[in-house]
C-alpha cells in the first residue's frame, strides 16, 4: 500500500470536456510537483484528444480515457466513439477507478468538478476514502458568475461532496484576487479547508521553432485567436464579417484557429 513505499505517487483527474486550459494547468502542477520532490511520480487522467502532443517531464505520465465534448445546448456527447454518452461515461468511470486502484496514489487531486463529469469520479472517491487517501479539489481562482455557479453546484450536489470527500480545497491564486466560491453557502468546516496556493510561474521554452507566418502588410496586423478553438467559430465569423463590411480601413488579420476547432466550422467560415 501507499504508506509502505519509498516513492510517493500523485494521481490527477483532469476535467477535459472542452479546451486546453484544464490540461495545461494539470500539466503545470505535475511538473512543479516532480521538480520539488525527486521521489514523486504523477499520473494524469485525461480525455483530451491531444494530450499525447504535449511533452511531459520524467516521472509524469498520463492515461487517456475516452473523450467527450460539450455541445452548445449543454449536452455531452462522445468525442470520437459512436456510442451513447452514458456508455462513454461508464467506460471513463471504470478506467478512472481501476487506474486509481492499481496506481494506489498517496494523494488524489481532482480538477474543478467535485464529483467529476456527471459524477464519474464518485466511485473512485469512495474507494480512496476507504483507504484513507488524502483528496484535494483544485479550483482556478476565477470560476463563473456566483449565481450561475451556485445553481450549477446545487444541481450537481457538489457542496455535500466537499464535506464528504475532500481534505483540502486548493484555489490556484490569491485571496486578494478572487474567491471563486464567494456565491456558495459553504459550511464553516469546508471554508476552513480552502488553501490559496498562489500562482506557478510560467516558463517559456528557450528555443521554440517559429511557425510560418504570412507576410503582413506594412508590418502591422491584427492577431485573432480563440484558445483551443472549440467554441471560437462565432468569434472568427464576426471578425470576418467586419472585414467584409469595411476591410479597407482595417489592418491585415492573422487568424489562429486552435486544435479543437471543428473542420465543419472551419469550412463554413466566409473566407473570400
Task: Please provide the spans of the model-predicted regions.
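Active-site-proximal region of nucleotide-activated glycan assembly enzymes
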Residues: 125-196
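Conserved nucleotide-sugar donor-binding subdomain of glycosyltransferases
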Residues: 78-118
Amino acid at each position: 500500500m501507499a504508506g509502505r513505499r519509498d516513492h510517493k505517487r500523485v494521481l490527477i483527474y483532469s476535467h477535459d470536456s472542452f479546451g486546453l486550459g484544464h490540461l495545461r494547468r494539470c500539466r503545470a502542477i505535475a511538473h512543479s510537483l516532480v521538480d520539488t520532490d525527486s521521489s514523486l511520480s504523477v499520473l494524469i487522467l485525461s480525455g483530451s484528444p491531444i494530450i499525447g502532443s504535449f511533452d511531459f517531464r520524467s516521472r509524469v505520465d498520463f492515461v487517456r480515457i475516452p473523450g467527450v465534448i460539450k455541445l452548445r445546448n449543454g449536452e455531452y456527447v462522445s468525442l470520437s466513439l459512436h456510442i451513447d454518452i452514458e456508455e462513454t461515461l461508464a467506460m471513463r468511470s471504470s478506467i478512472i477507478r481501476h487506474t486509481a486502484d492499481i496506481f494506489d496514489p498517496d494523494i488524489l487531486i481532482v480538477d474543478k468538478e467535485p464529483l467529476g463529469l456527471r459524477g464519474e469520479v464518485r466511485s473512485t472517491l469512495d474507494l480512496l476514502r476507504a483507504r484513507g487517501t488524502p483528496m484535494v479539489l483544485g479550483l482556478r481562482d476565477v470560476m463563473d458568475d456566483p449565481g450561475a455557479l451556485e445553481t450549477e453546484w446545487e444541481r450537481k450536489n457538489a457542496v455535500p461532496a466537499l464535506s464528504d470527500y475532500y481534505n483540502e480545497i486548493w484555489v490556484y491564486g490569491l485571496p486578494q484576487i478572487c474567491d471563486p466560491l464567494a456565491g456558495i453557502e459553504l459550511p464553516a468546516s469546508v471554508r476552513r479547508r480552502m488553501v490559496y496556493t498562489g500562482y506557478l510561474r510560467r516558463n517559456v521554452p528557450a528555443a521554440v521553432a517559429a511557425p510560418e507566418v504570412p507576410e503582413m502588410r506594412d508590418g502591422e496586423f491584427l492577431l485573432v485567436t480563440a484558445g483551443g478553438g472549440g467554441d471560437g467559430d462565432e468569434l472568427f465569423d464576426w471578425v470576418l464579417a467586419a472585414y467584409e463590411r469595411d476591410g479597407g480601413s482595417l489592418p491585415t488579420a492573422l487568424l489562429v484557429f486552435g486544435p479543437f476547432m471543428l473542420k465543419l466550422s472551419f469550412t463554413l467560415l466566409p473566407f473570400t
